[in-house]
Amino acid sequence: MLVMTEYLLSAGICMAIVSILLIGMAISNVSKGQYAKRFFFFATSCLVLTLVVVSSLSSSANASQTDNGVNRSGSEDPTVYSATSTKKLHKEPATLIKAIDGDTVKLMYKGQPMTFRLLLVDTPETKHPKKGVEKYGPEASAFTKKMVENAKKIEVEFDKGQRTDKYGRGLAYIYADGKMVNEALVRQGLAKVAYVYKPNNTHEQHLRKSEAQAKKEKLNIWSEDNADSGQ
Protein backbone atom coordinates (compact mmCIF):
# COMPACT_ATOMS: atom_id res chain seq x y z
CA MET A 1 0.00 0.00 0.00
CA LEU A 2 2.83 2.38 0.87
CA VAL A 3 4.67 1.63 -2.39
CA MET A 4 1.52 2.37 -4.44
CA THR A 5 1.03 5.65 -2.57
CA GLU A 6 4.60 6.72 -3.30
CA TYR A 7 4.14 5.81 -6.97
CA LEU A 8 0.98 7.90 -7.26
CA LEU A 9 2.69 10.76 -5.44
CA SER A 10 5.52 10.77 -7.96
CA ALA A 11 3.01 10.69 -10.81
CA GLY A 12 1.17 13.66 -9.28
CA ILE A 13 4.36 15.68 -9.11
CA CYS A 14 5.02 14.97 -12.78
CA MET A 15 1.47 16.12 -13.62
CA ALA A 16 2.09 19.35 -11.72
CA ILE A 17 5.23 20.02 -13.73
CA VAL A 18 3.39 19.36 -16.99
CA SER A 19 0.55 21.68 -15.91
CA ILE A 20 3.03 24.46 -15.17
CA LEU A 21 4.56 24.05 -18.62
CA LEU A 22 1.09 24.20 -20.19
CA ILE A 23 0.30 27.39 -18.29
CA GLY A 24 3.55 28.86 -19.53
CA MET A 25 2.61 28.02 -23.10
CA ALA A 26 -0.88 29.48 -22.60
CA ILE A 27 0.51 32.73 -21.21
CA SER A 28 2.86 33.10 -24.15
CA ASN A 29 -0.09 32.66 -26.55
CA VAL A 30 -2.81 34.46 -24.56
CA SER A 31 -2.83 37.35 -27.02
CA LYS A 32 -3.70 35.02 -29.87
CA GLY A 33 -7.39 34.79 -29.05
CA GLN A 34 -10.19 33.05 -27.23
CA TYR A 35 -8.75 29.59 -27.81
CA ALA A 36 -5.56 30.52 -25.98
CA LYS A 37 -7.56 31.87 -23.02
CA ARG A 38 -9.51 28.63 -22.76
CA PHE A 39 -6.27 26.69 -22.91
CA PHE A 40 -4.86 28.85 -20.09
CA PHE A 41 -7.96 28.20 -17.95
CA PHE A 42 -7.71 24.45 -18.60
CA ALA A 43 -4.01 24.31 -17.68
CA THR A 44 -4.60 26.30 -14.48
CA SER A 45 -7.43 23.95 -13.46
CA CYS A 46 -5.18 20.94 -14.05
CA LEU A 47 -2.49 22.46 -11.84
CA VAL A 48 -4.91 23.16 -8.97
CA LEU A 49 -6.38 19.65 -9.18
CA THR A 50 -2.91 18.11 -9.28
CA LEU A 51 -1.78 20.06 -6.21
CA VAL A 52 -4.85 18.84 -4.28
CA VAL A 53 -4.12 15.21 -5.24
CA VAL A 54 -0.43 15.54 -4.35
CA SER A 55 -1.28 17.04 -0.95
CA SER A 56 -3.72 14.21 -0.20
CA LEU A 57 -1.24 11.51 -1.21
CA SER A 58 1.50 13.13 0.86
CA SER A 59 -0.69 13.00 3.98
CA SER A 60 -1.53 9.36 3.28
CA ALA A 61 2.16 8.48 2.92
CA ASN A 62 3.03 10.13 6.23
CA ALA A 63 0.25 8.22 7.98
CA SER A 64 1.50 4.93 6.53
CA GLN A 65 5.05 5.63 7.71
CA THR A 66 3.96 5.87 11.34
CA ASP A 67 1.63 2.85 11.29
CA ASN A 68 1.74 0.74 14.49
CA GLY A 69 3.62 3.47 16.31
CA VAL A 70 6.91 3.01 14.43
CA ASN A 71 8.02 5.24 11.56
CA ARG A 72 10.11 4.01 8.66
CA SER A 73 13.39 5.04 10.27
CA GLY A 74 12.61 2.57 13.08
CA SER A 75 12.10 5.10 15.88
CA GLU A 76 9.18 4.62 18.24
CA ASP A 77 6.21 6.95 18.54
CA PRO A 78 5.87 7.35 22.31
CA THR A 79 2.19 8.27 22.05
CA VAL A 80 1.34 4.89 20.54
CA TYR A 81 3.93 2.37 21.72
CA SER A 82 5.35 1.82 25.18
CA ALA A 83 7.63 -1.08 26.19
CA THR A 84 8.07 -2.27 29.77
CA SER A 85 11.69 -3.13 30.46
CA THR A 86 12.71 -5.87 32.88
CA LYS A 87 15.74 -5.31 35.03
CA LYS A 88 18.30 -7.99 34.21
CA LEU A 89 20.77 -9.40 36.68
CA HIS A 90 24.45 -9.11 35.93
CA LYS A 91 27.59 -10.56 37.46
CA GLU A 92 30.34 -8.40 38.94
CA PRO A 93 33.95 -9.43 39.64
CA ALA A 94 35.26 -10.02 43.15
CA THR A 95 38.23 -11.74 44.78
CA LEU A 96 38.18 -14.22 47.63
CA ILE A 97 39.35 -13.26 51.10
CA LYS A 98 38.06 -16.36 52.87
CA ALA A 99 35.17 -18.79 53.15
CA ILE A 100 33.45 -18.37 56.53
CA ASP A 101 30.96 -21.26 56.47
CA GLY A 102 28.66 -23.04 54.05
CA ASP A 103 26.54 -20.04 53.12
CA THR A 104 28.84 -17.13 53.98
CA VAL A 105 32.02 -15.88 52.30
CA LYS A 106 34.18 -12.79 52.60
CA LEU A 107 35.20 -11.13 49.34
CA MET A 108 37.03 -8.09 48.11
CA TYR A 109 34.31 -6.25 46.19
CA LYS A 110 34.89 -2.93 44.44
CA GLY A 111 38.08 -2.43 46.40
CA GLN A 112 36.46 -3.04 49.79
CA PRO A 113 36.23 -6.19 51.96
CA MET A 114 32.63 -7.34 52.27
CA THR A 115 30.94 -10.36 53.81
CA PHE A 116 28.35 -12.02 51.57
CA ARG A 117 25.40 -14.22 52.59
CA LEU A 118 24.37 -16.59 49.80
CA LEU A 119 20.84 -15.76 48.62
CA LEU A 120 17.93 -18.21 48.91
CA VAL A 121 19.88 -20.97 50.68
CA ASP A 122 20.57 -22.11 54.22
CA THR A 123 23.28 -24.58 55.20
CA PRO A 124 23.59 -26.38 58.55
CA GLU A 125 25.38 -24.28 61.18
CA THR A 126 29.01 -24.61 62.26
CA LYS A 127 29.58 -21.42 64.25
CA HIS A 128 26.19 -20.58 65.71
CA PRO A 129 26.43 -19.43 69.37
CA LYS A 130 23.38 -21.46 70.41
CA LYS A 131 23.04 -24.25 67.83
CA GLY A 132 26.72 -25.07 67.72
CA VAL A 133 27.85 -27.47 65.00
CA GLU A 134 24.95 -29.09 63.17
CA LYS A 135 25.02 -32.30 61.17
CA TYR A 136 26.40 -31.74 57.64
CA GLY A 137 27.51 -28.25 58.65
CA PRO A 138 31.23 -29.07 58.31
CA GLU A 139 30.59 -30.80 54.98
CA ALA A 140 28.75 -27.75 53.64
CA SER A 141 31.54 -25.44 54.82
CA ALA A 142 34.20 -27.64 53.23
CA PHE A 143 32.24 -27.79 49.96
CA THR A 144 31.92 -24.01 49.70
CA LYS A 145 35.55 -23.48 50.69
CA LYS A 146 36.76 -25.89 48.02
CA MET A 147 34.63 -24.26 45.30
CA VAL A 148 35.73 -20.69 45.96
CA GLU A 149 39.37 -21.43 46.79
CA ASN A 150 39.92 -23.50 43.65
CA ALA A 151 38.20 -20.98 41.37
CA LYS A 152 40.19 -18.71 39.09
CA LYS A 153 37.27 -16.29 38.83
CA ILE A 154 34.79 -15.22 41.51
CA GLU A 155 31.68 -13.20 40.66
CA VAL A 156 28.76 -11.81 42.63
CA GLU A 157 25.26 -11.33 41.29
CA PHE A 158 22.77 -9.20 43.21
CA ASP A 159 19.04 -9.71 42.71
CA LYS A 160 16.40 -7.05 42.07
CA GLY A 161 15.67 -6.07 45.66
CA GLN A 162 17.56 -5.38 48.86
CA ARG A 163 21.34 -5.84 48.54
CA THR A 164 22.29 -6.12 52.21
CA ASP A 165 20.77 -7.68 55.32
CA LYS A 166 20.41 -6.15 58.79
CA TYR A 167 23.98 -7.18 59.60
CA GLY A 168 25.38 -5.32 56.59
CA ARG A 169 26.21 -8.50 54.70
CA GLY A 170 25.80 -8.52 50.94
CA LEU A 171 22.94 -10.70 49.68
CA ALA A 172 23.97 -12.28 46.41
CA TYR A 173 24.45 -15.32 44.23
CA ILE A 174 28.14 -16.27 44.24
CA TYR A 175 29.78 -17.80 41.17
CA ALA A 176 33.02 -19.79 41.10
CA ASP A 177 34.35 -20.13 37.56
CA GLY A 178 30.83 -19.57 36.26
CA LYS A 179 29.15 -22.12 38.55
CA MET A 180 26.65 -20.84 41.10
CA VAL A 181 27.76 -21.87 44.59
CA ASN A 182 24.21 -21.44 45.93
CA GLU A 183 22.84 -23.98 43.46
CA ALA A 184 25.74 -26.40 43.88
CA LEU A 185 25.15 -26.61 47.63
CA VAL A 186 21.43 -27.29 47.13
CA ARG A 187 22.10 -29.88 44.44
CA GLN A 188 24.46 -31.79 46.75
CA GLY A 189 21.92 -31.83 49.56
CA LEU A 190 24.12 -29.54 51.68
CA ALA A 191 21.67 -26.62 51.74
CA LYS A 192 17.93 -26.03 51.69
CA VAL A 193 16.08 -23.37 49.72
CA ALA A 194 15.21 -20.80 52.40
CA TYR A 195 14.76 -17.12 53.21
CA VAL A 196 12.82 -16.44 50.01
CA TYR A 197 11.69 -12.83 49.85
CA LYS A 198 10.48 -11.15 46.67
CA PRO A 199 11.85 -9.61 44.53
CA ASN A 200 15.12 -11.30 45.55
CA ASN A 201 13.98 -14.65 44.14
CA THR A 202 14.92 -14.64 40.46
CA HIS A 203 16.64 -18.04 40.69
CA GLU A 204 14.14 -19.60 43.10
CA GLN A 205 12.59 -22.08 40.68
CA HIS A 206 15.98 -23.22 39.42
CA LEU A 207 17.10 -23.85 43.00
CA ARG A 208 13.90 -25.69 43.88
CA LYS A 209 14.41 -28.06 40.95
CA SER A 210 17.90 -28.83 42.23
CA GLU A 211 16.52 -29.33 45.73
CA ALA A 212 13.86 -31.73 44.45
CA GLN A 213 16.54 -33.77 42.71
CA ALA A 214 18.68 -33.88 45.86
CA LYS A 215 15.66 -35.06 47.85
CA LYS A 216 14.92 -37.73 45.28
CA GLU A 217 18.49 -39.00 45.52
CA LYS A 218 18.43 -38.65 49.35
CA LEU A 219 21.67 -36.73 49.42
CA ASN A 220 23.19 -35.64 52.75
CA ILE A 221 20.54 -33.63 54.68
CA TRP A 222 17.88 -35.51 52.71
CA SER A 223 19.23 -38.95 53.57
CA GLU A 224 16.80 -41.38 55.21
CA ASP A 225 18.25 -41.16 58.71
CA ASN A 226 18.36 -37.38 58.55
CA ALA A 227 15.31 -36.51 56.45
CA ASP A 228 13.29 -35.06 59.33
CA SER A 229 15.97 -32.52 60.20
CA GLY A 230 15.87 -31.24 56.67
CA GLN A 231 12.14 -30.73 56.40
Curated annotation (Swiss-Prot):
Keywords: Calcium, Endonuclease, Hydrolase, Membrane, Metal-binding, Nuclease, Secreted, Signal, Zymogen. Residues 61-86, 203-231 are annotated as: Disordered. It catalyses: Endonucleolytic cleavage to nucleoside 3'-phosphates and 3'-phosphooligonucleotide end-products. Binds 1 Ca(2+) ion per subunit. SMART domains: SNc. CDD domains: SNc. The keyword Plastid does not apply. GO terms for molecular function: endonuclease activity, active with either ribo- or deoxyribonucleic acids and producing 3'-phosphomonoesters; metal ion binding; nucleic acid binding. Pfam families: SNase. Ca(2+) binds at residues 103, 122-123. GO terms for cellular component: extracellular region; membrane. The keyword Amino-acid biosynthesis does not apply. Residues 61-73 have a biased composition (Polar residues). Residues 27-63, 64-82 form a propeptide. Residues 203-219 have a biased composition (Basic and acidic residues). Its cofactor is Ca(2+). Enzyme that catalyzes the hydrolysis of both DNA and RNA at the 5' position of the phosphodiester bond. Belongs to the thermonuclease family. This is Thermonuclease. It comes from Staphylococcus aureus.
